Amino acid sequence: INDSNYGNNILLTSDAATNIMKAGIIAAKRDNKIGSDGIADQAEIMTLRICTREGEPYLKDMALAIHYAVSHGADVIVLPEQNMLYPEEQKQWIIHELKEAEKKGAIVIVPAWNTSIDMDKVEFFPNRKMSKDKELTNLMIVASSDKKGNPVMDTNYGANTLDIYAPGTDIYSAYMGDTYRTGTGEGLAAATVAGVATLIKSYFPKLTGSQIRDILLKSVTSRKGVEVEKGIRVDDRPSQDLFLFDDLCISGGIVNAYQAILEAEKMNSQKK
């Protein structure tokens, strides 16, 4: 792509409120007794506006925004939710920029869609295997868990394609107009993982995005062997079934910030 401009100047989109909540989850100031505490309040948020007023963002804008973020030193990149429709030319744009992010050591975090679909059987984009010549090691797909540590019923899942679950139900965070609100959604779960990734990077800046992904996978609160109820689709109709948690995602668990820092410390000491 030869363009340098991306996105639009539309301030109030259908995703504006959610994106403010994501920023609050990641980096709201801690211990000031106002609203909520962010996970990594030393983070600097780079806001790149690609959302349209309604509907999905244009993939060209997304590719250019990733390029801008990587070129300006972003360590953690959060994308909009996965999508099923990636025309070949536009898919190659995204692949190229994700590879550049990988080379520069950035981790890219993507919320799964909430359509109760097994992503091992139906391909969603972006994903780690979308490039024919190599698997992307810095890309992480996240779905939402509830307060009891169970997967939200309508989240997508996949033993080989979904990386990790994270709290995404009834999350209190910053909102529009200097207010605070409780929200639910895959994007908030992805922001939680992004916050933990940012925390790791702040303590151990030499770790790469690929290493941080490995750390997050290894340090989960394990739910392996736990049977949970999960929404599915049968002949394109919603239904429900019982699964072992480890049959729903690669890590078999829920992100754990404390354990992630311990794992990062261990990996960092091995590098010396």
Stretches found by the model and what they are:
Residues 5, 9-12, 50-136, 178-190, ...:
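Substrate-binding/access-modulating region of protease and related hydrolase catalytic domains
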Residues 24, 37-38, 44-49, 70, ...:
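Structural recognition of the beta-strand scaffold that forms the well-ordered cores
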Residues 19, 23-26, 63-66, 95-98, ...:
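Extracytoplasmic/secreted envelope proteins and their assembly/folding machinery
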Residues 31-32, 51-52, 83, 146-148, ...:
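Active-site/binding-pocket entry motifs
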Residues 17, 57, 188-192, 249-255:
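Aromatic- and histidine-enriched alpha-helix N-cap/loop-to-helix transition segments
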Residues 70-81, 104, 137-141, 204-272:
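C-terminal subdomain of the subtilisin-like protease fold in secreted/lumenal serine endopeptidases
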Residues 1-58, 137-138, 148-149, 157-161, ...:
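Subtilisin-like serine protease catalytic core
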Residues 128-202, 206:
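Extracellular S/T/G-rich loop segment that most often corresponds to the catalytic His/Ser-adjacent loop
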